[in-house]
Amino acid sequence: RTVIALVAGHVGLTEEKIRVISHDIGGGFGGKVPVYPGYVIAIAVSFLVGKPVKWIEDRSENLQADSFARDYHITAEMAGTKDGKIQATRFKVLADHGYTDASANPSKFPTGLFSIASGSYDYDASYMEADAVYTNKPPGGVAYRCSFRVTEAVHAIERITDRFALEIGKDPAALRMQNFIKKEDFPWKSPTGWEYDSGDYHAGLQKAMDAIDYVGLRKEQAEKRKKGELMGIGISTFTEIVGAGPSKDFDILGIKMFDSAEIRVHPTGKAIARFGTKSQGQGHETTYAQIIAEELGIPMENIQIEEGDTDTAPYGLGTYASRSTPTAGAAAAVAARKLRDKARKIAAYLLEVSEN
């Protein structure tokens, strides 16, 4: 839908006159989120010359013109007590956006950087400032596995947590255990205003430490260092926001990042469901059918899933950032429940019985 919105705005067409058909895609990983200039330019040129125009690029050209990863320059600070209690963090970010904005930029800082950089820790204050700059690089969109700048945010908070542990002479795992949000404190609101719905971080880290025999590894590390041998042990814990859906927090081109599902049940008992997402190998056909089958009681094999054609798909913002099941899948569940409730009312009327 972002392709349609951008093409409509630049070429001067109304959106209902534009159709996007997407065939099977071999993976996405964030690099296919932006609407790159070549897409729009090819269509504009087609109008100018009055002939079909095809946009083709080889692998080398794609690497030169596609979105790039990282290139965030982050200065991070952490304040805490001598006994290891984190009190505050401060982040200053200089972000390279390339020569043009990509479609997901409005969501990049608030949802990616600001939601993650405060970490999984219980403290009161966090200050964040981000400046975006234009350079002569390709569009600085949602690059390969960047997930709205989550990677950079995790790196920043975890590095300064390690530095804090080193400064006060405390084990990095023990410092994290001391500062984790407690299980009984959920739901919990972060210093930047994000609500964490649930979690058990202490149990998660403890399970990982037990699996690798963390205490034994530390002893081995100490013995090796006595011999002049180097052995590093790294720990990283983070809470990632996924689902890219709540419209109050996520936005692309002012469209908001919701998704929809349309389900029709035929007299034969078979159903067809249409979505605005597009499978890139995740298996939407199975997942969505399972959700609908669970809600309606229709066998999975009797449910047809359709994606990839904007002429038939309901309005939605597509597949990326681990969002298809939380958004479109949730929409499928809600739509199926409405169908189920309607069917119960009709059946109750025809059979002259209670809906229950």
Locate the predicted segments by residue.
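Acidic, glycine-rich active-site loops and adjacent beta-strand->loop/helix elements
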Residues: 1, 23-28, 57-67, 93-98, ...
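Helix-loop-helix junctions that connect adjacent transmembrane helices in secondary transporters/permeases
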Residues: 1-11, 180-270, 290
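Alpha-helical support elements that line or immediately flank enzyme active sites
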Residues: 1-49, 106-118, 145-179, 203, ...
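Short acidic, glycine/serine/threonine-rich loops at helix termini
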Residues: 4-6, 29-35, 65-70, 90-92, ...
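Short coil/turn connectors at secondary-structure junctions
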Residues: 13-17, 49-53, 73-74, 81-89, ...
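Phosphate/diphosphate-binding loops
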Residues: 47-98, 215, 329-356
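Glycine-rich loop/linker segments at domain edges
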Residues: 71-159, 250-258, 326
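Flexible glycine/proline-rich, aromatic-decorated loop/lid segments
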Residues: 95, 124-133, 178, 254-258, ...
